[in-house]
Amino acid sequence: MVHLTKTLRFINNPGFRKFYYGLQGYNKYGLYYDDFYDYTDAAHLEAVRRLPPDLYDQHTYRLVRASQLEITKQFLPKEQWPSYEEDMDKGRFLTPYLDEVMKEKKEKEEWINFLSKD
């Protein structure tokens, strides 16, 4: 148990999080954390559908640019890489919409379960 506590404390360390963020490498393509989502999950698709047009366009632009960079085997210049702090601020653009969709889904399931008890 002590080992697990030390491990969790190490993982939650901001220095380790920044280090791991750099290892993941998606920032080299100019992508944010929420640019990766499960395209087969209905909740994620609904959250993307609810994005405001400007956020959706920015998301699409980042994906197209990253695809082009991957095809040409290049990375963005280091000045254009999103920092860890920027990713924590701007990079979680889909999370509020996804949380909203999940709450609606849970509420709908609870309502159906309530109605089916009778």
Curated annotation (Swiss-Prot):
Keyword Electron transport carried by entry: yes
Region of interest (IgE-binding. Immunodominant epitope), residue spans: 1-32
One matching Pfam family: UCR_14kD
GO CC terms: matrix side of mitochondrial inner membrane; respiratory chain complex III
Gene3D superfamilies from the UniProt entry: Cytochrome b-c1 complex subunit 7
Record GO biological process: mitochondrial electron transport, ubiquinol to cytochrome c
InterPro entries per the UniProt record, alphabetical: QCR7, QCR7_sf
Task of the protein: Component of the ubiquinol-cytochrome c oxidoreductase, a multisubunit transmembrane complex that is part of the mitochondrial electron transport chain which drives oxidative phosphorylation.
Subunit composition and interactions: Component of the ubiquinol-cytochrome c oxidoreductase (cytochrome b-c1 complex, complex III, CIII), a multisubunit enzyme composed of 3 respiratory subunits cytochrome b, cytochrome c1 and Rieske protein, 2 core protein subunits, and additional low-molecular weight protein subunits. The complex exists as an obligatory dimer and forms supercomplexes (SCs) in the inner mitochondrial membrane with cytochrome c oxidase (complex IV, CIV).
Protein name: Cytochrome b-c1 complex subunit 7
Taxonomic source organism: Dermatophagoides farinae
